[in-house]
């Protein structure tokens, strides 16, 4: 998402920026609260326009079959709990993008759980134990410290 922050408040400036690809336009002065609210809205919108659904995703030795809700590592089916699968599937559908803790918690557990980062960390640890050859050095899900997680695709995938 692109949010333009500008001192220019003329309509033609706003129209030019929005027509040029900006998702929002905010004119100075503005409060930090308004800016963060607009960032949250832009992020929600960007996640709603998720990439087209593909029936399967394969990277390295990991295969996720979204239609069958199955996960395989090196051809072996891995049993995930329903919540673990939802976390993995959401991250995989947004591969390469940083998904914040709050976004992931709201999507999987609901808005009331947006601050339950400990719950998310516990589930992420369980997912890594099941998927990763070396859970301490993950290949598939990278922690973006203080922000969230990113699902990684191997080069050429």
Task: Tell where the protein language model's regions lie, with residue ranges.
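Short coil-to-helix segment of the ABC ATPase nucleotide-binding domain corresponding to the Q-loop/switch region
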Residues: 33, 97-108
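Short helix-capping/turn signature of helix-turn-helix
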Residues: 93-95, 111, 147
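Short, Lys/Arg-enriched segments at the junction into DNA-binding effector domains
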Residues: 41-98, 102
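Flexible coil/turn residues that form the inter-helical turn or adjacent wing/linker of helix-turn-helix
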Residues: 28, 97, 113
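C-terminal end segment of the histidine kinase catalytic
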Residues: 50, 153-157
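Basic, amphipathic DNA-recognition helix from helix-turn-helix-like DNA-binding domains
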Residues: 1-58
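DNA-recognition element of transcription regulators
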Residues: 31-44, 79-89, 101, 114-134, ...
């Amino acid at each position: 998402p692109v949010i333009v922050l500008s001192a220019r408040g003329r309509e033609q400036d706003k129209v030019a920026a929005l027509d040029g690809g900006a998702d929002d336009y905010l004119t100075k002065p503005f409060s930090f609260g308004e800016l963060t609210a607009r960032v949250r809205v832009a992020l929600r919108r960007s996640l709603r326009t998720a990439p087209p659904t593909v029936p399967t995703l394969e990277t390295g030795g990991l295969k996720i079959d979204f239609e069958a809700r199955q996960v395989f590592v090196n051809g072996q089916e891995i049993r995930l709990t329903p919540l673990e699968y939802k976390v993995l599937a959401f991250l995989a559908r947004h591969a390469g993008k940083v998904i914040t803790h709050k976004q992931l918690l709201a999507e999987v557990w609901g808005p009331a759980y947006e601050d339950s980062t400990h719950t998310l960390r516990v589930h992420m640890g369980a997912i890594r134990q099941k998927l990763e050859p070396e859970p301490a050095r993950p290949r598939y899900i990278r922690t973006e410290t203080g922000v969230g997680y990113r699902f990684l695709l191997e080069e050429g995938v």
